[in-house]
Amino acid sequence: MPQGFLARVAGRTRQIFATVVSAGVGNAGNIVALDATGRLDESVLPVGIGADTTQAVASEALGAGKFVNYHDDGGVFSVRLADNSNGRHADGFVLEAVAEAATATVYPLDGTNAELTGLTIGARYWLGTAGSVTAMPLDETDAGNANKISQYLGVAKSATELVTDDDGYVVL
């Protein structure tokens, strides 16, 4: 429950609770409160202000924290797992699991992916297979890596957070 405060309403002292999620104009003038994650809900922000995200249909199931690739799926702007082995560079990442055919919220690179595990603080990471990351970049001189994607993704801030960088990619 959000914090409450005392206010004079129609000549009487009343306890009023801050608004966590706005229902729109009915909440005009309310004081806002942080949600359970310690952040403001997007519904209380002005139009045009909020997370820089893109909505796309998932053409396959996506796990939380996976890096994804935009593509055209039969004329539908869609998203699938990024993969260094089959030419699918990473365009962004998802923070929540998404079922196939559901709408995914994709966060662009240059943000923090906080849904990973097993990272080493300060280590650099590259795109792996099936939306994952790897601590070892592909060897450009290995003929077995021909036509694979070499894409630096960022540096680990913690065991679960990768500060991503939109550094581009190279097809080997």
Where are these regions (language model features)?
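Short, flexible helix/strand-to-coil boundary loops that buttress conserved ligand/catalytic motifs
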Residues: 44
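Proline-centered structural pivot motif
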Residues: 39-41
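Glycine-anchored, exposed beta-strand/edge motif detector
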Residues: 2-10, 25-28, 47-172
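Small-residue hinge/turn detector
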Residues: 31-32
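Intrinsically disordered, low-complexity regulatory segments in eukaryotic proteins
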Residues: 15-25
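Beta-strand repeat architectures
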Residues: 35-36
